[in-house]
Protein backbone atom coordinates (compact mmCIF):
# COMPACT_ATOMS: atom_id res chain seq x y z
CA UNK A 1 0.00 0.00 0.00
CA UNK A 2 1.18 3.53 -0.72
CA UNK A 3 2.12 5.90 2.02
CA UNK A 4 -0.09 8.87 2.77
CA UNK A 5 1.15 12.22 1.54
CA UNK A 6 2.57 14.38 4.27
CA UNK A 7 -0.16 16.83 5.31
CA UNK A 8 2.00 19.90 4.74
CA UNK A 9 2.10 19.02 1.02
CA UNK A 10 -1.72 19.01 0.94
CA UNK A 11 -2.80 21.97 3.07
CA UNK A 12 -1.22 24.88 4.80
CA UNK A 13 -3.12 26.24 7.77
CA UNK A 14 -4.74 29.07 5.78
CA UNK A 15 -5.98 26.73 3.06
CA UNK A 16 -7.28 24.31 5.69
CA UNK A 17 -9.07 27.24 7.35
CA UNK A 18 -10.81 28.09 4.07
CA UNK A 19 -11.82 24.47 3.53
CA UNK A 20 -13.13 24.20 7.08
CA UNK A 21 -15.23 27.32 6.44
CA UNK A 22 -16.76 25.57 3.42
CA UNK A 23 -17.50 22.41 5.41
CA UNK A 24 -19.06 24.28 8.33
CA UNK A 25 -21.14 26.46 5.99
CA UNK A 26 -22.32 23.49 3.92
CA UNK A 27 -23.38 21.69 7.09
CA UNK A 28 -25.18 24.67 8.59
CA UNK A 29 -22.73 24.96 11.47
CA UNK A 30 -22.11 28.61 12.35
CA UNK A 31 -20.69 28.50 15.88
CA UNK A 32 -17.03 28.85 14.87
CA UNK A 33 -15.24 32.16 14.23
CA UNK A 34 -12.43 32.72 11.72
CA UNK A 35 -9.74 32.59 14.43
CA UNK A 36 -11.25 29.43 15.93
CA UNK A 37 -11.31 27.78 12.50
CA UNK A 38 -7.65 28.65 12.09
CA UNK A 39 -6.87 26.94 15.40
CA UNK A 40 -8.84 23.87 14.33
CA UNK A 41 -6.90 23.86 11.06
CA UNK A 42 -3.67 23.97 13.06
CA UNK A 43 -4.87 21.06 15.20
CA UNK A 44 -5.78 19.07 12.07
CA UNK A 45 -2.29 19.65 10.69
CA UNK A 46 -0.68 18.43 13.93
CA UNK A 47 -2.90 15.34 13.91
CA UNK A 48 -1.91 14.50 10.35
CA UNK A 49 1.79 15.16 10.93
CA UNK A 50 1.70 12.52 13.67
CA UNK A 51 -0.87 10.19 12.11
CA UNK A 52 1.48 7.88 10.23
CA UNK A 53 3.52 7.22 13.37
CA UNK A 54 0.74 7.16 15.95
CA UNK A 55 -2.42 6.15 14.05
CA UNK A 56 -4.63 8.45 16.13
CA UNK A 57 -7.64 8.30 13.80
CA UNK A 58 -8.80 6.35 10.76
CA UNK A 59 -10.14 9.64 9.36
CA UNK A 60 -7.65 11.50 7.18
CA UNK A 61 -9.63 13.79 4.88
CA UNK A 62 -10.19 17.27 6.28
CA UNK A 63 -13.92 17.08 5.58
CA UNK A 64 -14.26 13.83 7.54
CA UNK A 65 -12.23 15.12 10.49
CA UNK A 66 -14.23 18.37 10.47
CA UNK A 67 -17.58 16.57 10.66
CA UNK A 68 -16.86 13.48 12.74
CA UNK A 69 -14.33 14.98 15.15
CA UNK A 70 -14.57 18.79 15.23
CA UNK A 71 -18.33 19.32 14.80
CA UNK A 72 -19.03 16.17 16.81
CA UNK A 73 -16.95 17.57 19.69
CA UNK A 74 -18.45 21.06 19.86
CA UNK A 75 -22.05 20.65 18.69
CA UNK A 76 -23.11 19.98 22.28
CA UNK A 77 -22.75 23.74 22.84
CA UNK A 78 -26.15 23.98 21.13
CA UNK A 79 -27.81 21.69 23.63
CA UNK A 80 -26.29 22.21 27.07
CA UNK A 81 -24.32 24.60 29.27
CA UNK A 82 -20.94 23.16 30.23
CA UNK A 83 -19.57 23.61 33.75
CA UNK A 84 -15.92 24.46 34.34
CA UNK A 85 -13.30 23.40 35.32
CA UNK A 86 -14.09 20.56 32.91
CA UNK A 87 -12.35 17.16 32.86
CA UNK A 88 -12.22 15.25 29.56
CA UNK A 89 -12.13 11.58 30.55
CA UNK A 90 -10.21 9.38 28.10
CA UNK A 91 -9.51 12.17 25.64
CA UNK A 92 -7.32 10.09 23.29
CA UNK A 93 -5.65 12.54 20.87
CA UNK A 94 -7.78 15.37 22.26
CA UNK A 95 -11.49 14.81 21.56
CA UNK A 96 -13.61 16.55 22.61
CA UNK A 97 -11.21 18.47 24.87
CA UNK A 98 -9.04 20.32 22.32
CA UNK A 99 -11.92 21.60 20.15
CA UNK A 100 -13.77 22.65 23.32
CA UNK A 101 -10.63 24.43 24.55
CA UNK A 102 -10.57 26.35 21.27
CA UNK A 103 -14.22 27.32 21.73
CA UNK A 104 -13.78 28.23 25.43
CA UNK A 105 -10.29 29.80 25.52
CA UNK A 106 -10.70 31.38 28.96
CA UNK A 107 -12.06 28.30 30.73
CA UNK A 108 -10.05 25.63 32.54
CA UNK A 109 -10.04 22.22 30.84
CA UNK A 110 -8.20 19.08 31.93
CA UNK A 111 -7.40 16.25 29.54
CA UNK A 112 -7.23 12.80 31.15
CA UNK A 113 -5.35 10.16 29.14
CA UNK A 114 -3.50 7.05 30.27
CA UNK A 115 -1.60 6.18 27.06
CA UNK A 116 1.82 7.83 27.20
CA UNK A 117 2.29 8.43 23.47
CA UNK A 118 -1.02 10.29 23.39
CA UNK A 119 -0.01 12.29 26.46
CA UNK A 120 3.17 13.41 24.71
CA UNK A 121 1.16 14.39 21.63
CA UNK A 122 -1.28 16.42 23.75
CA UNK A 123 1.61 18.27 25.38
CA UNK A 124 3.02 18.98 21.93
CA UNK A 125 -0.34 20.35 20.77
CA UNK A 126 -0.63 22.54 23.87
CA UNK A 127 2.84 23.98 23.25
CA UNK A 128 2.51 24.41 19.47
CA UNK A 129 -0.91 26.05 19.70
CA UNK A 130 -0.10 28.04 22.86
CA UNK A 131 -3.25 26.84 24.60
CA UNK A 132 -3.67 28.34 28.06
CA UNK A 133 -5.61 26.95 31.03
CA UNK A 134 -5.18 23.43 29.66
CA UNK A 135 -3.84 20.76 32.01
CA UNK A 136 -2.86 17.27 30.87
CA UNK A 137 -3.26 14.42 33.33
CA UNK A 138 -1.09 11.52 32.23
CA UNK A 139 -3.10 8.71 33.80
CA UNK A 140 -6.39 6.91 33.55
CA UNK A 141 -9.20 8.54 35.50
CA UNK A 142 -10.51 6.10 38.08
CA UNK A 143 -12.26 6.05 41.46
CA UNK A 144 -9.02 6.94 43.28
CA UNK A 145 -8.45 10.18 41.36
CA UNK A 146 -9.22 13.46 43.09
CA UNK A 147 -9.03 16.33 40.60
CA UNK A 148 -11.62 18.88 41.76
CA UNK A 149 -13.80 19.92 38.81
CA UNK A 150 -17.37 21.09 38.24
CA UNK A 151 -17.86 19.07 35.08
CA UNK A 152 -16.62 15.90 33.39
CA UNK A 153 -17.14 15.00 29.74
CA UNK A 154 -16.38 11.93 27.67
CA UNK A 155 -16.74 10.75 24.10
CA UNK A 156 -15.14 7.42 24.99
CA UNK A 157 -16.96 4.09 24.71
CA UNK A 158 -16.77 3.25 28.42
CA UNK A 159 -20.09 2.36 30.02
CA UNK A 160 -21.97 5.25 31.68
CA UNK A 161 -22.01 3.55 35.08
CA UNK A 162 -18.27 2.95 35.08
CA UNK A 163 -17.55 6.58 34.26
CA UNK A 164 -19.94 7.87 36.94
CA UNK A 165 -18.02 5.81 39.48
CA UNK A 166 -14.63 6.91 38.21
CA UNK A 167 -15.38 10.65 38.42
CA UNK A 168 -17.34 10.55 41.70
CA UNK A 169 -14.42 11.78 43.82
CA UNK A 170 -13.65 14.63 41.38
CA UNK A 171 -17.08 16.26 41.37
CA UNK A 172 -18.65 18.55 43.94
CA UNK A 173 -22.38 18.35 44.65
CA UNK A 174 -24.11 19.87 41.62
CA UNK A 175 -21.26 18.89 39.31
CA UNK A 176 -22.26 17.43 35.97
CA UNK A 177 -21.12 14.56 33.77
CA UNK A 178 -21.68 14.89 30.01
CA UNK A 179 -21.81 11.71 27.93
CA UNK A 180 -21.53 11.96 24.14
CA UNK A 181 -23.11 8.69 23.04
CA UNK A 182 -24.71 6.91 20.12
CA UNK A 183 -28.46 6.28 19.71
CA UNK A 184 -28.41 2.86 21.40
CA UNK A 185 -27.46 4.13 24.86
CA UNK A 186 -30.81 3.28 26.49
CA UNK A 187 -29.66 0.13 28.35
CA UNK A 188 -26.69 2.02 29.84
CA UNK A 189 -29.06 4.70 31.14
CA UNK A 190 -31.30 2.10 32.76
CA UNK A 191 -28.34 0.34 34.39
CA UNK A 192 -26.93 3.66 35.66
CA UNK A 193 -30.29 4.53 37.24
CA UNK A 194 -30.26 1.25 39.13
CA UNK A 195 -26.63 1.42 40.24
CA UNK A 196 -26.09 5.17 40.72
CA UNK A 197 -29.55 6.68 41.27
CA UNK A 198 -28.70 7.49 44.89
CA UNK A 199 -25.78 9.69 43.84
CA UNK A 200 -26.67 11.10 40.41
CA UNK A 201 -29.83 12.30 38.71
CA UNK A 202 -30.39 12.35 34.95
CA UNK A 203 -30.95 15.98 33.92
CA UNK A 204 -30.73 15.85 30.10
CA UNK A 205 -31.18 13.26 27.38
CA UNK A 206 -31.06 14.88 23.94
CA UNK A 207 -31.20 13.00 20.63
CA UNK A 208 -29.72 14.80 17.62
CA UNK A 209 -27.84 14.21 14.37
CA UNK A 210 -24.65 15.74 13.06
CA UNK A 211 -25.86 18.46 10.64
CA UNK A 212 -26.62 17.28 7.09
CA UNK A 213 -25.53 13.71 7.90
CA UNK A 214 -27.27 10.46 8.95
CA UNK A 215 -25.02 10.16 12.03
CA UNK A 216 -27.24 10.00 15.14
CA UNK A 217 -26.06 11.00 18.60
CA UNK A 218 -27.35 11.20 22.19
CA UNK A 219 -26.17 13.71 24.77
CA UNK A 220 -26.81 12.30 28.25
CA UNK A 221 -26.14 14.55 31.25
CA UNK A 222 -26.06 13.61 34.94
CA UNK A 223 -25.85 15.85 37.99
CA UNK A 224 -24.20 14.69 41.20
CA UNK A 225 -26.63 14.90 44.13
CA UNK A 226 -24.80 13.07 46.92
CA UNK A 227 -21.25 12.28 48.00
CA UNK A 228 -20.03 8.81 48.77
CA UNK A 229 -17.04 7.94 50.99
CA UNK A 230 -13.67 8.09 49.28
CA UNK A 231 -12.56 4.56 48.35
CA UNK A 232 -9.61 3.03 50.12
CA UNK A 233 -6.48 3.20 48.00
CA UNK A 234 -5.37 0.04 46.28
CA UNK A 235 -1.76 -0.90 46.84
CA UNK A 236 0.37 1.19 44.53
CA UNK A 237 -2.36 3.78 43.86
CA UNK A 238 -1.62 7.42 44.53
CA UNK A 239 -4.00 10.37 44.66
CA UNK A 240 -1.78 12.66 42.63
CA UNK A 241 -2.22 15.97 40.87
CA UNK A 242 1.27 15.64 39.44
CA UNK A 243 0.51 17.22 36.07
CA UNK A 244 -0.89 20.40 37.65
CA UNK A 245 1.17 23.44 38.48
CA UNK A 246 1.64 24.48 42.10
CA UNK A 247 -0.46 27.55 41.36
CA UNK A 248 -3.34 25.39 40.12
CA UNK A 249 -3.07 23.10 43.13
CA UNK A 250 -3.34 26.12 45.44
CA UNK A 251 -6.24 27.60 43.48
CA UNK A 252 -8.21 24.38 43.63
CA UNK A 253 -7.41 23.68 47.28
CA UNK A 254 -10.70 25.39 48.22
CA UNK A 255 -12.78 22.62 46.57
Swiss-Prot record:
Native organism taxonomy: Bacteria, Pseudomonadati, Bdellovibrionota, Bdellovibrionia, Bdellovibrionales
Domain of life: Bacteria
Keyword Methyltransferase: yes
Record's subcellular location: Cytoplasm
Chain residues that bind S-adenosyl-L-methionine: 90, 95, 155
NCBIfam families, per database record: rsmG_gidB
EC number: 2.1.1.170
Organism: Bdellovibrio bacteriovorus (strain ATCC 15356 / DSM 50701 / NCIMB 9529 / HD100)
Keyword line: Cytoplasm, Methyltransferase, rRNA processing, S-adenosyl-L-methionine, Transferase
The protein's name: Ribosomal RNA small subunit methyltransferase G 2
Protein role: Specifically methylates the N7 position of guanine in position 527 of 16S rRNA.
Catalysed reactions, semicolon-separated: guanosine(527) in 16S rRNA + S-adenosyl-L-methionine = N(7)-methylguanosine(527) in 16S rRNA + S-adenosyl-L-homocysteine
Sequence segments annotated as region (Disordered): 233-255
Amino acid sequence: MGRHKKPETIYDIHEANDRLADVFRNHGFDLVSHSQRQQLAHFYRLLMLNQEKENFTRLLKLRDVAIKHFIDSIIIMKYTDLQFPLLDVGTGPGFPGIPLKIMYPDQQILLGEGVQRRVEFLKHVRSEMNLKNLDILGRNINKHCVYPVRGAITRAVEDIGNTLGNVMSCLEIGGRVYFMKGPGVGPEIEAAKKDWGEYYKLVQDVAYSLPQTPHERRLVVYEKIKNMPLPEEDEGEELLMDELSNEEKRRWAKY
